[in-house]
């Protein structure tokens, strides 16, 4: 698998294709799935505190034999960890769970709680070298605007549901002036066969 990369607004390059481990059980199942993905050429793994499998992702990264700087790891903070001071504690605990030195991309998972205080701590974590890039997940409308307006470091990534049935064009235009990249979850739809059976995709697949 040949990787392509997208340059974020802070100059770092994120692998365009990644493997998410949402709902993958912690332990060998997550670790082996990540190791196989890395073997096939993936260089981006997406996890979260809420997934409860960060330790297994970290084990796969360490055991892969691939240089750390070649693997991009995204994780997400849950709202229970939001708040100035509290978020930094959450980041430090995440670093222990992953045990890979630093986090490539850290996202706020949901737009509830003290996300403004959390953002301040995330900016500090970037300055301290704990995190390379920061962004948001599932933020929209007024709360997205609130973070953008106050942020010293503009979100590098906004991760949202995004696929051919739900293209989020207005949201993409809204964040474009800040260089914020939209990142898709559910890129192939909701796991059913509807999207993949669309004639345009089946015709492309045959080519």
Model-predicted segments: where are they?
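N-terminal binding-site loop/beta-alpha segment at the start of enzyme catalytic domains
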Residues: 1-71, 188
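Conserved, mostly hydrophobic/aromatic
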Residues: 19, 37, 45, 57, ...
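Acidic-and-aromatic substrate-binding clefts and catalytic sites of carbohydrate-active enzymes
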Residues: 24-28, 46-56, 80-85, 111-115, ...
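Short, acidic/polar
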Residues: 25-38, 82-99, 117, 142-146, ...
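A structural motif
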Residues: 42, 100-103, 131, 155
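A short, structured active-site edge motif that brings together acidic residues
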Residues: 68-81, 102-111, 138
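CE4/NodB-like, metal-dependent polysaccharide N-deacetylase domain
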Residues: 87-107, 124-128, 180
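Beta/alpha (TIM)-barrel catalytic core signal, keyed to glycine-rich beta->alpha loops juxtaposed to Asp/Glu
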Residues: 110-207
């Amino acid at each position: 698998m040949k990787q392509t990369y997208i340059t974020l607004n802070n100059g770092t390059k994120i692998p365009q294709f990644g493997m998410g481990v949402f709902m993958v059980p912690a332990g060998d199942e997550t670790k082996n799935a990540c190791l196989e993905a890395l073997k096939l050429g993936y260089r981006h793994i997406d996890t979260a505190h809420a997934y409860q499998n960060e330790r297994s992702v970290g084990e796969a990264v360490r055991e892969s034999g691939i240089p750390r700087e070649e693997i991009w790891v995204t994780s997400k903070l849950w709202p229970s960890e939001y708040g100035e001071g509290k978020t930094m504690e959450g980041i430090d605990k995440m670093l222990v769970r992953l045990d890979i030195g630093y986090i490539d991309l850290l996202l706020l998972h949901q737009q509830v709680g003290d996300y403004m205080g959390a953002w301040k701590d995330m900016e500090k974590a970037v300055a301290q070298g704990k995190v390379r890039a920061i962004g948001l997940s599932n933020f929209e409308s007024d709360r997205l605007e609130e973070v953008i307006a106050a942020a010293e470091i503009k979100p590098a990534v906004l991760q949202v549901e995004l696929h051919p049935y739900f293209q989020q064009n207005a949201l993409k235009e809204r964040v474009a002036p800040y260089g914020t990249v939209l990142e898709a979850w559910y890129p192939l739809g909701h796991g059913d066969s509807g999207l993949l059976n669309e004639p345009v995709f089946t015709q492309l697949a045959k080519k």
